Amino acid sequence: MSYSNVINLLTDRLKLDLLPELGGRVNQLVFNEFDIFLPFQTQVIKPLQTYKGGSFSLVPFSNRIKNSMFNFNQLEYKLAMNDPPNAIHGHAYLGKWNVLKKTDSSAVIVYKHLAKKFGWPWAYEVFQTITLEDNNI
C-alpha cells in the first residue's frame, strides 16, 4: 500500500513531510540539510505497525494499556489490541486525518473518531497545527 498524499512544508532551513492519510504523522524532518527524522518508504508501511517510525500524536492515550482493558465509572472497557496483548499509543495514528488548511510552511489537520471504534467508548475530534518558522517547529 502506498500513501500518495504527502504534505510538504518548507522554510529556508526546515523541511517537513506530513502524511495525513497515515495517522497525521511527520514522516521526514530536515534542518539545514541534516535529517532529524529519516523518512521511511511509504510502500513498505504495515498499517498496524505504524508506530515504528516518524512522529505522531498519541491520542487518546499514550504508551500501553495492559491487556487492552481499563475500568472507568465501574465499567470495564476492552480495546482492540494493536500490540498484543496490549493496546498501544491510542488510535489516531491509525486513522486518516483531513487537511483543513495548508500554506507553504504550515498545515492544520483533523482526525474524527467515532464512538466504539477500536473499542474506545467515546467519540472525539483532535487537531494538529504544524508551523515551521526559521529554525522552529
Could you describe each region identified by the protein language model?
Residues 1-136:
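Surface-exposed acidic/polar loop and edge beta-strand patches at domain peripheries
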